[in-house]
């Protein structure tokens, strides 16, 4: 792989809650535990143990990543804060996995890189 472009955002996805008494066995197929942290740019998120992000939850996450990359505000796409503890920021959002088991907090951080499309990197 030749990653030649520096992404304009980096993303952190933290596991902040797991239903079922916090135990993943019998609940979370991916094995997510409170405190697990996934990171990514444009690639798929990977946690501190090198394990990939839940494929079902990725269906929810990807549109949020694109919202940020497109200059959008995560507060404007609806939802709520399951923990009731989200900073008032356009770059932070909590969401629950499709199975209703794991609660994640997405945080985006601007890297200083230019947008892939408006920065002149994309070529047809």
Segments from the language model and where they lie:
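Short, basic/aromatic beta-hairpin or loop at an interaction surface
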Residues: 2-19
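Solvent-exposed loop and beta-edge segments used for protein-protein assembly and interaction
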Residues: 5-7, 34, 98
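Beta-strand secondary-structure signal
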Residues: 10-14, 39, 103-105
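Beta-strand elements of well-folded, non-transmembrane domains
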Residues: 17-19, 46, 110-112
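Short N-terminal binding/cap micro-motifs at the start of the first secondary-structure element
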Residues: 20-26
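Short, flexible N-terminal segments of the mature chain
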Residues: 26-48
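Short, compositionally biased
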Residues: 49-72
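Short, compact, well-ordered microdomains
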Residues: 72-124
């Amino acid at each position: 792989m030749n990653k030649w472009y520096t992404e304009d955002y980096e993303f952190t996805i933290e596991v902040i809650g797991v239903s079922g008494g916090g135990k993943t066995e019998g609940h979370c197929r991916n094995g997510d535990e409170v405190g697990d942290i996934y990171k990514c740019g444009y690639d798929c998120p990977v946690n501190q143990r090198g394990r990939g992000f839940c494929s079902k939850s990725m269906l929810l996450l990807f549109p949020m990543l694109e919202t940020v990359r497109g200059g959008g505000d995560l507060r404007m796409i609806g939802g709520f804060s399951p923990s009731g503890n989200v900073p008032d920021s356009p770059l932070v959002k909590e969401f629950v996995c499709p199975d209703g088991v794991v609660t994640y907090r997405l945080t985006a951080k601007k890297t200083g890189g230019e947008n892939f499309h408006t920065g002149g990197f994309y070529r047809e």
